[in-house]
Amino acid sequence: MVEIKILKKTDDSITFILEGVDVAFANALRRTILGEVPTFAVDEVEFYENDSALFDEIIAHRLAMIPLKTPVDRFELDALELDDYTVTLSLEAEGPGIVYSGDLKSDDPDVKPANPDIPIVKLAKGQRLVFNAFAKLGRGKDHAKWQPGFTYYKYFTRIHISKEIEGWEKLKKLAKKRGLPVKENENEVIVETIKPFYIPKEFEEYEGKGIWEEIVPNTYVFVVETNGELPVEEIVKIALKILMRKADRFINELQGLAG
């Protein structure tokens, strides 16, 4: 049975334990988050004036990498086919001053820069910048600008520390200071590595003897971070739904081939 236990959640990241799946599924979830969850990003730019020190192409690249809010309730983001919808972000600015992402004016109030304080270009006195940028839905597998964030996972392990080794109390103290769950019995201390725990060099001689690591089967610690386009928990939900839809499509096609 698949279980998810949330360890920590902030506005821009979530850490959870995924239990009851093999490494193939864990990696499929990671790849789906990075490559399949759609977001809005600038895909084309029409420049009308650009007197700045930067070429059009450089500004266009900077615009493409600005995270844009992507409304979950308006678009079927877990669909295998994306909506053909374009948002126009316009700008008309004159120096002196710095042009920020918050200066972009969107024709859709729900699709706008997630962070208004990203600098785009510095304009000197008399310099002007006028353009229309066109954003559309896309997937990270086509370009990194559509990635909703970043994710990685590690095996969930337990480090067993024998009380027969000299200085075991120090390792217990270090683990607690690191914020790791610690269990203890009369023979050993057990540290659960919900995040990395590095054994000091002075204890290297005990590794494999008085100190050993147990890999918990089919259990992983996942970390997901959002760029701001989507709430972090929605990224995980959408990725899981996309995986389910792909599996359903695969099964249906197999049944069709079987006649």
Swiss-Prot record:
Keywords: Cytoplasm, DNA-directed RNA polymerase, Nucleotidyltransferase, Transcription, Transferase. InterPro entries: DNA-dir_RNA_pol_30-40kDasu_CS, DNA-dir_RNA_pol_insert, DNA-dir_RNA_pol_RpoA/D/Rpb3, RBP11-like, RNAP_Rpo3/Rpb3/RPAC1, RNApol_insert_sf, Rpo3/RPB3_RNA_Pol_subunit. It is an enzyme of class 2 (transferase). Gene3D superfamilies: 3.30.70.3110, DNA-directed RNA polymerase, insert domain (2.170.120.12), RNA polymerase, RBP11-like subunit (3.30.1360.10). NCBIfam families: PRK00783.1. HAMAP family: RNApol_arch_Rpo3. This is DNA-directed RNA polymerase subunit Rpo3. It comes from Pyrococcus abyssi (strain GE5 / Orsay). The gene is rpo3.
